[in-house]
């Protein structure tokens, strides 16, 4: 049997407490295989309903919510990237481990599942390690979930770390 050569692991995070548990799995797998981790945080766009409500409240002459959202995301990307770096360094214990283990830190604006799949392709990820919020199969069927979409559309293996409240 041929053992797969895993060099790059994509770790999408929402920066929650559960994300720290998922990161620890990513770290252990990467260390065992000599791989590096791409850390990804996705900023989702406002829903049409939220945009409509906000646009209805804003006085005329002010940017629409789409423009405001884009400007806000761009302004926050650098701050969020630094927060993600700090989060990873805190979990790893020191910055030298961060430099050796982390290939890239990205903050991308878009729909979570699609961005995860796109970035996995861009970075030639060999594995995606992500959390699931433990919704029931029924709610996943009705609502869908990021993890469910990624598992079914990914061209590489996906390891899911369940959330247990």
Summary of predicted features, one role per range:
Residues 1-4, 46, 78, 82, ...:
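Structural beta-alpha unit
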Residues 2-66:
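Small/aliphatic-rich secondary-structure junction motif
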Residues 27, 92, 148:
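Active-site phosphate/pyrophosphate- and oxyanion-stabilizing loops and adjacent acidic/basic residues
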Residues 63-78, 102:
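Short glycine/proline- and acidic residue-enriched helix-loop micro-motifs
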Residues 114, 118-165:
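Gly/Ser-rich helix-loop-strand patches that form or flank binding pockets
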